[in-house]
UniProtKB/Swiss-Prot annotation:
This is Small ribosomal subunit protein uS9. Pfam families: Ribosomal_S9 (PF00380). Keywords: Ribonucleoprotein, Ribosomal protein. One of its GO terms (cellular component) is cytosolic small ribosomal subunit. GO terms for molecular function: RNA binding; structural constituent of ribosome. Coiled coil: none annotated. SUPFAM superfamilies: Ribosomal protein S5 domain 2-like. It comes from the Bacteria. InterPro entries: Ribosomal_Su5_D2-typ_SF, Ribosomal_uS9, Ribosomal_uS9_bac/plastid, Ribosomal_uS9_CS, Ribsml_uS5_D2-typ_fold_subgr. The keyword Ribosomal protein applies. The keyword Ribosomal protein applies. Belongs to the universal ribosomal protein uS9 family. PANTHER family: RIBOSOMAL PROTEIN S9 (PTHR21569), SMALL RIBOSOMAL SUBUNIT PROTEIN US9M (PTHR21569:SF1).
Amino acid sequence: MADTIQSLDQLSALKPAESEAPKHTKKVDKYGRAYATGKRKDAVARVWIKPGAGKILVNAREVDVYFARPVLRMMIQQPLVAAARAGQYDVVCTVAGGGLSGQAGAVRHGLSKALTHFEPELRGVLKKGGFLTRDSRVVERKKYGKAKARRSFQFSKR
């Protein structure tokens, strides 16, 4: 505390400490894959991506077999389409917990994070699309004295 400020002129002469934005670097393993974990509701997806022909495997099965509904397949493809990287990466993921919709959301979240690990410059595009944000909505717990979380038992006057 040797340098005490005596006047406002000295205060304005002080330079604020410049805080730089964090530099995002490429994070790949020894096999050239980027890894990320995605979550949605009760589902957790572990996702690995590497450059390839655009093949997507979910729990050792083709994406068309695992996610039969076209909406779920489209959901998984969204980060790749937004980043203009459709068909350029092979995706291998294992997903557990929850239902199919939650699992598709978890894979999408993990795939987005893995893309940012592989190509940090895609972070802005994916963040703008909302793919890097974990959807925190989960099922509300059941309360005592209630039929479900909020539903009351049927009222009877007599």
